[in-house]
Swiss-Prot record:
<keyword id="KW-0130">Cell adhesion</keyword>
<comment type="function">
    <text>Promotes cell proliferation, chemotaxis, angiogenesis and cell adhesion. Appears to play a role in wound healing by up-regulating, in skin fibroblasts, the expression of a number of genes involved in angiogenesis, inflammation and matrix remodeling including VEGA-A, VEGA-C, MMP1, MMP3, TIMP1, uPA, PAI-1 and integrins alpha-3 and alpha-5. CCN1-mediated gene regulation is dependent on heparin-binding. Down-regulates the expression of alpha-1 and alpha-2 subunits of collagen type-1.</text>
</comment>
<feature type="disulfide bond">
    <location>
        <begin position="314"/>
        <end position="353"/>
    </location>
</feature>
<dbReference type="GO" id="GO:0030501">
    <property type="term" value="P:positive regulation of bone mineralization"/>
</dbReference>
<dbReference type="GO" id="GO:0043065">
    <property type="term" value="P:positive regulation of apoptotic process"/>
</dbReference>
<dbReference type="GO" id="GO:0007229">
    <property type="term" value="P:integrin-mediated signaling pathway"/>
</dbReference>
<feature type="disulfide bond">
    <location>
        <begin position="70"/>
        <end position="91"/>
    </location>
</feature>
<dbReference type="GO" id="GO:0060591">
    <property type="term" value="P:chondroblast differentiation"/>
</dbReference>
<dbReference type="InterPro" id="IPR000884">
    <property type="entry name" value="TSP1_rpt"/>
</dbReference>
<feature type="domain" description="IGFBP N-terminal">
    <location>
        <begin position="25"/>
        <end position="94"/>
    </location>
</feature>
<dbReference type="GO" id="GO:0062023">
    <property type="term" value="C:collagen-containing extracellular matrix"/>
</dbReference>
<dbReference type="GO" id="GO:0005788">
    <property type="term" value="C:endoplasmic reticulum lumen"/>
</dbReference>
<feature type="domain" description="VWFC">
    <location>
        <begin position="98"/>
        <end position="164"/>
    </location>
</feature>
<dbReference type="InterPro" id="IPR009030">
    <property type="entry name" value="Growth_fac_rcpt_cys_sf"/>
</dbReference>
<comment type="subunit">
    <text>Interaction with integrins is heparin- and cell-type-dependent and promotes cell adhesion. In skin fibroblasts it binds ITGA6/ITGB1, in endothelial cells, binds ITGAV/ITGB3 and in platelets, ITGA2B/ITGB3. Binds, in vitro, ITGAV/ITGB5.</text>
</comment>
<feature type="disulfide bond">
    <location>
        <begin position="322"/>
        <end position="359"/>
    </location>
</feature>
<feature type="region of interest" description="Heparin-binding">
    <location>
        <begin position="279"/>
        <end position="315"/>
    </location>
</feature>
Amino acid sequence: MSSRIARALALVVTLLHLTRLALSTCPAACHCPLEAPKCAPGVGLVRDGCGCCKVCAKQLNEDCSKTQPCDHTKGLECNFGASSTALKGICRAQSEGRPCEYNSRIYQNGESFQPNCKHQCTCIDGAVGCIPLCPQELSLPNLGCPNPRLVKVTGQCCEEWVCDEDSIKDPMEDQDGLLGKELGFDASEVELTRNNELIAVGKGSSLKRLPVFGMEPRILYNPLQGQKCIVQTTSWSQCSKTCGTGISTRVTNDNPECRLVKETRICEVRPCGQPVYSSLKKGKKCSKTKKSPEPVRFTYAGCLSVKKYRPKYCGSCVDGRCCTPQLTRTVKMRFRCEDGETFSKNVMMIQSCKCNYNCPHANEAAFPFYRLFNDIHKFRD
């Protein structure tokens, strides 16, 4: 009797073990939902261990498995402990990652935290990366919104765009009117410029343009809607960093809806720690443009560019002048992550630089800070 019970228990244990093994193995064919899952703020999408479906990456100290991998972009890995047959583990930071100090607190590598209600941050190997939790504050207001402004909403953290009516006189109207007469602008044109509106091209014309553009823009015609659109694009802004990876932005309406949208690109004026005087020729005070001595891969969010490039960087001067990009182009660059996931980002490639004494952003603190929605940007406190 006891031998039968022992055999039955052994059979049950064997079946349970086989079931666990079956659940841990990858399917012969991938069957994924049509829509990607929606993850919490600061949580990225990664492919499961079988390379099939996109899932929300597990964060620090969360349970993980082959089908529920950890967020490798934050330096996390699934720790199964000493057991070689364990099916579930816990997301731990890789041992080589450095902790972060932010606002007088220490955070471990891979640890996520929320310093305020508007940002979700993560410690990534000694640097803190944050994403905004209020994306509407980073976007442009809708066209036709007079005097748009961000206002606080009772009981909410994020501010919202509010459109004012023309019942209250703008104190800038008199100044705009004076400037308009002196510079030859129409008063309505100045008002539309401030409101981010498109204005008519010529009298009685149904075409529109932005006053900030001096050259004639091209015309985009939508036959389905029967509308004409003047395609206009502003120049790229300065890079948000004097050295290292930064962000550059511009505004354009080059899309089927003819809507003003903000575009971003990754930029790097020069690597941090670049020697200032070593490359100067005898008698020269400036080194305008420098080319990378060897092909390099760009890095972004822990992923590497598929191709290697030899980018140009701006140099420096010894007489107080600063060197900034003069001519640039934008390259659509493909990146590949450790799990095989690929994505594309716009990247600035410098063609030439210029050096002058006009250095309004020589102080790093004076730089405008641009954020890419749903991306992580590194900065040090």
